[in-house]
């Protein structure tokens, strides 16, 4: 039994989001929620919201017991990048890349 939740186009760099995803991969959902609650990274709040959605999906759609769930898979894929311009001296300009992510969490029975 698996339940999936996704957050597409999350406004955070995939590199930064993967740091948080690596912390909870393979952990029980209780332990993962605790880790995310006390992490002071922006990505932790986004990943926590997706994890809570996956838990709710497992409970509602599959009738799973929350105590038996763990984070089977979590991965962060790169979303589209917004290109922005930052003016510089002497008529030059630099390109700013505002990256986005697709966060996917899969919870399953142990």
From Swiss-Prot:
InterPro entries: Ribosomal_uL22, Ribosomal_uL22_bac/chlpt-type, Ribosomal_uL22_bac/org-type, Ribosomal_uL22_CS, Ribosomal_uL22_sf
Keywords: Ribonucleoprotein, Ribosomal protein, RNA-binding, rRNA-binding
Annotated SUPFAM superfamilies: Ribosomal protein L22
GO biological process, one term: translation
Domain of life where this protein originates: Bacteria
This protein's record includes keyword S-adenosyl-L-methionine: no
Database matches in Pfam families: Ribosomal_L22 (PF00237)
Entry GO MF terms: rRNA binding; structural constituent of ribosome
S-S pairs: none
UniProt-listed HAMAP family: Ribosomal_uL22_B
Subunit and partners: Part of the 50S ribosomal subunit.
Membership in a protein family: Belongs to the universal ribosomal protein uL22 family.
Protein name per its UniProtKB record: Large ribosomal subunit protein uL22
Organism: Vibrio parahaemolyticus serotype O3:K6 (strain RIMD 2210633)
